[in-house]
Amino acid sequence: SNTSRPARTAKPKPLRYGVRCIRSPYRNGFGFAVRAGLEVFEGDAVAIMMADGSDSPTDLVAYFRLLQAGYDCAFGSRFMPGAKVYDYPRYKLVLNRVVNLGIRLLFGHGYNDTTNAFKAYRRVVIENIQPLLSHHFNLTVELPLKSVVRGYSYGIVPVSWTNREAGVAKFSLSNETGSRYLFIILYVFLERHLSRGDYHRDGQ
């Protein structure tokens, strides 16, 4: 978002690190911030990472290799052999596993960490899963579920995750948050079963 600490501290870095800092034209919200970036990114693929350091840049190499191997999407799992998770709050961990199990059973895609924001996509995927509807953290499930339902291939690798050491997480657990996630999950589920393939990559 425009007012977050990462957004403010990113301003002096472009000349030193080659980082391009953009200001979102939308109101605050995780989903809006990511969508603003997806509208202007350059290149053949894009990776989405948290700005608080919880995701490891080293795992980007594994994502890149998946895309090089021909997959349309590169997904990471924090809960498979080889993955490492540090200081995940227990109540959030329990809820995470329950939600991801439900999504896995509902969509039958065999992926156990759909809610993880850290993923990479080819440009063609981002272009063909529009329009994106999520304003908030529910974008973390809209992106991968639409990609899978619309027929794009994906590879999964173990990744590491470390709880932030400073600052306050913007994500909070509430009935409002749950309803937003449920809306997106049901929206994509209904697309899968009622659209008769109108949005599938083979039907576009």
Would you name each region that the model predicts?
Residues 22-40, 45-48, 57-137, 164-182:
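Acceptor/aglycone-binding surface of glycosyltransferases and processive sugar-polymer synthases
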Residues 1, 49-51:
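Active-site acidic Asp-centered loop
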Residues 4-5, 54-56:
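A short, conserved beta-strand element in the Rossmann-like catalytic core
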Residues 10-12, 63, 143:
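Aromatic/hydrophobic pocket-lining residues that form π-stacking "cages" and hydrophobic walls in ligand
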Residues 1-22:
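Acidic donor-binding segment of Leloir-type glycosyltransferases
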Residues 19, 46, 154:
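Hydrophobic anchor at the start of a short beta-strand
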